[in-house]
């Protein structure tokens, strides 16, 4: 066999092995990530213990990033069409911001209401890149109803296929129907962002 042809076939064999390894690694990753890959259409909620267990497992995956942003006590609610509302930008890790065009495979945003929020109190929570004003009986299409129950985490978003630049523009919106219960300058919720990005599929993640 001529050396050039042999080199070509050897290179193709290496590429095929690398592709199979990537597919196996990503399939394993998908299984590991299944606890958080819930879409908003199902209005999911899960126990906070399940989320933290998944988080501790996912931290071991190369390329995986988790960050946390808190609705701080200085948050002042405003009123809009009869609703108490609040919003906060997402805090995106600097390591991701250095690659604004990096494509995201999965994003899950988990909301945990502050334990001081009464269990009977009701919120609607949404994530988006622009303000969509709620009206009586009507909320943004991706808004999820959550209640003030300690220990409950709510996955409100699963948004594949966008870039880090888009993620940095997203804001978390909270709508509350009872302004008096929440009051001004109240802690409301902690939000965690789980991100899996395309670097996981690159060569450095191929198992040897």
Swiss-Prot record:
Residues 1-12 have a biased composition (Basic and acidic residues). GO terms for molecular function: RNA binding. One of its GO terms (cellular component) is viral nucleocapsid. Keywords: Capsid protein, Ribonucleoprotein, RNA-binding, T=3 icosahedral capsid protein, Viral nucleoprotein, Virion. The keyword RNA-binding applies. Residues 1-23 are annotated as: Disordered. Residues 13-22 have a biased composition (Basic residues). It is found in: Virion. Capsid protein self-assembles to form a quasi spherical capsid, about 25-35 nm. This is Capsid protein. It comes from Pelargonium zonate spot virus (isolate Tomato/Italy/1982) (PZSV). The lineage of its organism: Viruses, Riboviria, Orthornavirae, Kitrinoviricota, Alsuviricetes.
